[in-house]
Amino acid sequence: MTDALGSIDMPDAEDETREKKARKGGKRGKKGPLGRLALFYRQIVAELRKVVWPTRNQLTTYTTVVIVFVVIMIGLVTVIDFGFEKAIKFVFG
């Protein structure tokens, strides 16, 4: 990168060797495909435990709101389509 003075910011050689060493080794790097798959599923379960699930009452409310909104949008699109149909028939006969 170039700063305001025009000098180039170069990483040190020590930083590069530390990064390379940090990527090597570790428990994750030595597991086979089945071990990585098991780790993946364990992480999924751990993340799903963090989810705050809605109560039955909240779920019913949200579902009702979505269905009402969809019905209103269907009605709106139907009215607009009917209006365009009448306008096209009026213009083109």
UniProtKB/Swiss-Prot annotation:
Single GO term (MF): protein transmembrane transporter activity
According to its UniProt record, where is this protein mainly located?
membrane
For bias kind Basic residues, which ranges apply?
Answer: 20-33
Q: Which InterPro entries match?
A: SecE_bac, SecE_sf, Translocase_SecE/Sec61-g
GO biological processes: intracellular protein transmembrane transport; protein secretion; protein targeting; protein transport by the Sec complex
Q: Which Pfam families match?
A: SecE
Annotated compartments: Cell membrane
Q: Is the keyword Cytoplasm in the record?
A: no
Q: What function is annotated for this protein?
A: Essential subunit of the Sec protein translocation channel SecYEG. Clamps together the 2 halves of SecY. May contact the channel plug during translocation.
Q: How does it assemble?
A: Component of the Sec protein translocase complex. Heterotrimer consisting of SecY, SecE and SecG subunits. The heterotrimers can form oligomers, although 1 heterotrimer is thought to be able to translocate proteins. Interacts with the ribosome. Interacts with SecDF, and other proteins may be involved. Interacts with SecA.
Instruction: Identify this protein by name.
Output: Protein translocase subunit SecE
Organism of provenance: Streptomyces virginiae (Streptomyces cinnamonensis)
